[in-house]
């Protein structure tokens, strides 16, 4: 497993990854973990893809590199068509973007962040703009129960959502313009979990890209996020501790570690507190056998990763209030010997959506989450570098 840390210039408010990728000289602070990694050709492609991020730092250096040795043609002609496909009994709908170039090309299937269920969400625009000029098709579909797709999200689980992505892969394999051996998944947040899950469940998938998806279980992630939300909103540490204790009591009931009466008593006492509205808790809870959350919180992304053999890129933002990045890195490092196919990067200054100019208050505002989109030049560059390394991107 290769760990990389990337730090690049900001592109405030920019939705153009091409402009970000083609900026001038880039400077990166490099931390190299001599215990777990070595320099590779990946580190030499661009300054934005330099090894590595680690708790143990053997040395530090500032590296200056020339601009990227290629130019993505942002005016490429792209064929955009609506496509429907079957996933079990459901009909799902999306849009396929295919650059008009010769030969069969790779494709990326976008899997959904929890709060971004439809194909037109700004979170996915950069892929539609960035990848076709690099010779990569992009398929973005409406999640089941959203947009023009059938089904009901409440009746689904992570495995079903991952299987929707696999069904999309099978549909693309029948497209004469797509190389059936070079189709993979991209996902952010929950979509990152789904990308890993989908590729672990289908050996024909070629690669996975997981952005801002923690390597801890969902209950651990949500406790971390709620604690940060309350701190950002100005609550005291004592109030933060009370909120996390309340969430933990409910989760313990769902895991069979606490009886319903005591969990409900703790929850009842919390409902009158000013911080309760920020805890993502209801005023009561279902029995574990009827609770979707009880199923979700048992998902261990590390167990999924252990089943992945294909090339995988995992990226985090160092300023992400939703994800315990450090805890995720520690789990990844602990099993790095098992995952030579996995590369891990941390983008300095990037948040959960790979943006760099969004205030902490706006980052945790649920009403604004559907509007957030990547703007980090380092993220765009790192993504392009990895795709080029995998011989998926056509560059010159």
State what each model feature region is:
Residues 104-113:
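Short beta-strand element of the alpha/beta-hydrolase
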Residues 156-175:
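Alpha/beta-hydrolase active-site loop
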Residues 209-304:
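Accessory cap/linker subdomain of secreted extracellular hydrolases
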Residues 117-127, 143:
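The serine-hydrolase catalytic nucleophile loop
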Residues 171-235:
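Primarily recognizes the serine-hydrolase "nucleophile elbow" in alpha/beta-hydrolase
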Residues 63-101:
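N-terminal cap/lid segment of alpha/beta-hydrolase-fold proteins
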Residues 308, 314-316:
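Short beta-strand/loop motif that positions the catalytic acidic residue
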Residues 131-148:
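Conserved alpha/beta-hydrolase
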């Amino acid at each position: 497993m290769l760990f990389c840390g990337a730090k690049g210039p900001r592109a405030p408010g920019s939705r153009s990854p091409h402009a970000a990728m083609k900026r001038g000289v880039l400077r990166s602070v490099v931390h190299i973990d001599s215990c777990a990694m070595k320099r590779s050709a990946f580190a030499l492609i661009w300054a934005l893809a330099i090894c590595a991020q680690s708790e143990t730092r053997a040395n530090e250096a500032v590296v200056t590199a020339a601009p990227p040795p290629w130019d993505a043609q942002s005016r490429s002609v792209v064929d955009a068509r609506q496509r429907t496909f079957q996933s079990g009994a459901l009909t799902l709908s999306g849009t396929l973007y295919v650059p008009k170039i010769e030969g069969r090309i790779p494709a990326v299937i976008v899997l959904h962040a929890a709060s971004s269920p439809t194909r037109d969400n700004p979170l996915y625009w950069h892929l539609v703009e960035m990848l076709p000029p690099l010779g990569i098709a992009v398929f973005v579909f409406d999640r089941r129960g959203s947009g023009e797709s059938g089904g009901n999200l409440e009746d689904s689980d992570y495995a079903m959502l991952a299987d929707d992505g696999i069904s999309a892969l099978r549909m693309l394999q029948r497209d004469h313009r797509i190389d059936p051996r070079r189709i993979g998944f991209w996902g952010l947040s929950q979509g990152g979990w789904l990308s890993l899950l989908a590729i672990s469940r289908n050996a024909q998938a070629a690669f996975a890209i997981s952005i801002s998806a923690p390597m801890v279980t969902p209950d651990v992630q949500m406790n971390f996020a709620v604690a940060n939300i309350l701190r950002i909103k100005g609550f005291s540490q004592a109030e933060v501790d009370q909120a996390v204790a309340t969430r933990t009591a409910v989760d313990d009931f769902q895991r069979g570690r606490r009886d319903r009466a005591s969990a409900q008593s703790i929850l009842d006492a919390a409902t009158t507190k000013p911080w309760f509205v920020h805890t993502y808790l209801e005023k009561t809870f279902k029995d574990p056998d009827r609770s979707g959350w009880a199923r979700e919180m048992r998902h261990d992304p590390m167990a999924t990763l252990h089943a992945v053999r294909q090339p995988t890129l995992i990226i985090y933002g160092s300023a992400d209030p939703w994800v315990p990045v450090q805890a995720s890195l520690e789990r990844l490092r602990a099993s790095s010997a098992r995952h030579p196919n996995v590369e891990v990067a941390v983008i300095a200054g990037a948040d959960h959506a790979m943006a760099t100019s969004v205030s902490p208050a706006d980052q945790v505002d649920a009403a604004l989450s559907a509007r957030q989109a990547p703007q980090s030049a380092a993220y765009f560059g790192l993504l392009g570098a990895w795709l080029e390394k995998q011989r998926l991107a056509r560059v010159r």
